[in-house]
């Protein structure tokens, strides 16, 4: 199982130190998600994170940062849905329905499926599918190792997610 973390949408004091500590403790991938912020703040944060961890960071927006900082890749979403022209590299995408998962399986390294449980960071994101529907999607091959669950996953329900 990979440990993937999504940053909060706003910057905060000493965020670079916390991110570095998380990488030191085994964080596999960090999704740098800072919607509605100027790129210079992302640039500043990235300069404060040791270069050895850059190859484990995926950016949501400001895609030029991928090459400038030698990052792992880019993440596509409703806000930034299109792959940049001539882009080569890691691509992940947010999906909110089983239909979106089916449509985007090819051409992506993995898909983030949200919300599996009610999402605390986005109060309007309520779980869309029952456990039974998710199990059926898994049996049908819609949900596989390329699909990563998001949405209030914690120590109390992670085993349930793993069993899907």
Protein language model annotation of sequence segments:
Residues 117-123:
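A short acidic, helix-capping loop that chelates divalent metal ions and anchors anionic groups
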Residues 1-110, 139, 143-147, 153-164:
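Conserved N-terminal beta1-alpha1 strand-loop-helix module at the mouth
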Residues 44-46, 125-135:
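Charged helix-capping and loop-helix junction motifs
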Residues 109-117:
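Non-cysteine beta-strand/loop elements that form the S-adenosyl-L-methionine
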């Amino acid at each position: 199982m990979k440990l993937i973390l999504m940053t909060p949408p706003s910057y905060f004091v000493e965020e670079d130190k916390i991110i570095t500590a998380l990488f030191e403790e085994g964080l596999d991938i960090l999704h740098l998600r800072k919607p509605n912020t100027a790129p210079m703040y992302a640039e500043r944060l990235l300069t404060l994170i040791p270069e050895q961890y850059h190859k484990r960071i995926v950016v949501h927006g400001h895609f030029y940062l991928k090459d400038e900082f030698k990052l792992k890749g880019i993440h596509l979403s409703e806000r930034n849905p299109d792959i940049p022209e001539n882009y080569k590299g890691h691509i992940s995408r947010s999906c909110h329905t089983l239909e979106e998962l089916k449509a985007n399986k090819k051409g992506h390294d993995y898909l983030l499926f949200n919300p599996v449980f009610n999402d605390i960071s986005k109060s309007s994101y309520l779980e869309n599918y029952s456990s039974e529907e998710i199990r059926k999607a898994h049996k049908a091959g819609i949900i596989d190792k390329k699909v990563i669950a998001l949405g209030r996953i914690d120590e109390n329900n992670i085993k349930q997610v793993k069993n899907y």
